[in-house]
Amino acid sequence: MLAAPHLKARFDILTSIPGLGEITALVLLIDMPELGSMDAKHAASLAGLAPITRQSGQWRGKSFIQGGRATLRQAIYMPALVAIRFNPPLKAKYDALRAAGKPAKLAITAIMRRIITTANALLRDNRKWTETMA
């Protein structure tokens, strides 16, 4: 499928994450080629999964998700839903957020961010996912 050996290695690392399929791994490789060469906050911001807080002086608005690469954010949504069901550490994180009273969409966005930051760390360290990673 992938002719270049370094791309095949990156593809194998991404598909080792439970919930991330082949198509999502390809989208990550295409839309975010710098993944693995930055810190976690920058990766989340580039994917559009870092909250932006609206505030000015004493006035405080709400935080929201905006900016970044929309196609990447759209591509990671369904794998986040799959990971909530089949990836035990991410399911535990989702359940903890919901038990704390957070809305479902916020918890899903947190899982999306966790997937991106985990993928970034795995590609940076050049190793596959293990259950203790998340």
Locate predicted features.
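A detector of single, family-specific signature residues
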Residues: M1-A134
